[in-house]
Amino acid sequence: NIETIKSVYFVGAGGIGMSALIRYFLSKGKFVAGYDRTPSALTEHLIAEGAQIHYEEDVTLIPENCKDKGNTLVVYTPAIPQEHAELAYFHENGFEIHKRSQVLGTITRSSKGLCVAGTHGKTTTSTMAAHLFHQSHIGCTAFLGGISKNYGTNLLLSQTSPYTVIEADEFDRSFHWLSPYMSVITATDPDHLDIYGTCEAYLESFRHYTTLIQPGGALIIRKGLALQPDVQPGVKIYTYSRDEGDFHAENIRIGNGEIFIDFVAPDTRINDIRLGVPIGINIENGVAAMALAHLNGVTDEEIKQGMASFRGVDRRFDFKIKTDKLVFLSDYAHHPAEIAQSVKSIRELYKDKKITAIFQPHLYTRTKDFYKDFADSLSLLDEVILTEIYPAREQPIPGVSSRLIYDNLRPGIEKCICKKEDIPALLAKKPIEVLIVLGAGDLDNYVPSITRLLEQRANSES
């Protein structure tokens, strides 16, 4: 019973999904502590908000408050190995231990869950939907997979709204713990084959997820996916996409750094919506978020205002410099289909500019499974700088490195492989028009220094 526990201990406290739960338990007045492998801006924020976090794998650092097994809940992320010393201590001593996804499922079961699932697009779409609800007369609680730029957090709380917006993560089948009232499914391009084994098993996981949507609710699925939904009786199915489906956009106008669209629903049309983050892919993300909002009573005017005031998500098309001569942004894209969408959206905005990307592959298994697809997507760029693979939870795989991607890039593309720490020196000598940092690893830690370098160079040239 989550209400009666007094302390919560997190093994892997710095993950984006874990941090939303930490903030939730802090808001409930619980004593919160945990371990993470490395300090980050996120863990420092959590400490400032009241959590106790340490960075050594050491049982003696677990606070006494968290050693009372009758009053302590232990939450861990699948990225943490079972032999981790602290996790092993809790297992050996009979503590109640749950995965993050199980705890999230328990917390949200009593509310109307508005979930967003899919290989990619789910963080932006769920954050956009949360903003549409939060700024409307309805409100919402939200557990997000990224930091909302509107609110500076990945957790929104409402004491009155029946709705909870949830990013539904398919990794480790986490989303099977949820009980959605409604769900968007954005994409089902195979991923996490280290967990699923085959593309068919990955699709089957999404099919099972559709069976969890509650009668009276709805599935809003992107038109054209390979997935065959298997919903319960009483669950409506709607389709959406950029250009067709029950929900779609018309009269799309892109120019002068702005995007305007008309939103078309089965029973309404909202004209002249301005996208607060004017990137091509946000047309489709926006259609899904607006569909969720419209079906649950957010008014047309509130939708229009919310789309215009949406400021985006950290590390998702996150512009750091935007001038006539120089553009620099970072984007979390780490799957081949996602990278292709990112590059096409950037190309749409900057047709005549040279586009350079620094890409850090994320996971050895993903690189092994998709290196040719990564090369195809990155070949849409003018120049590619590859860094070493970010391992996250994995051990190296013999023969798997960034060189696999490098060797399969299209002939004629400018390309190099560079150590992370050498990137600033490399960029100092390069003419840059549009630069994008791609990936879900720790390359983002270098973004502030790259920003300073490019700003200094721009100032010295002006």
Question: Which role does the model predict for each range below?
Answer:
Residues 7, 72-73, 182, 218, ...:
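Structural motif
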Residues 70-71, 422-453:
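A glycine-rich beta-strand to alpha-helix segment
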Residues 1-115, 128-130, 244, 248, ...:
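Short, basic phosphate-binding NTP loop
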Residues 2-7, 17, 24, 28, ...:
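Nucleotide phosphate-binding/pyrophosphate-handling subdomain across enzymes
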Residues 24-30, 47, 61-66, 78-221, ...:
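Phosphate-binding loop of NTP-binding sites
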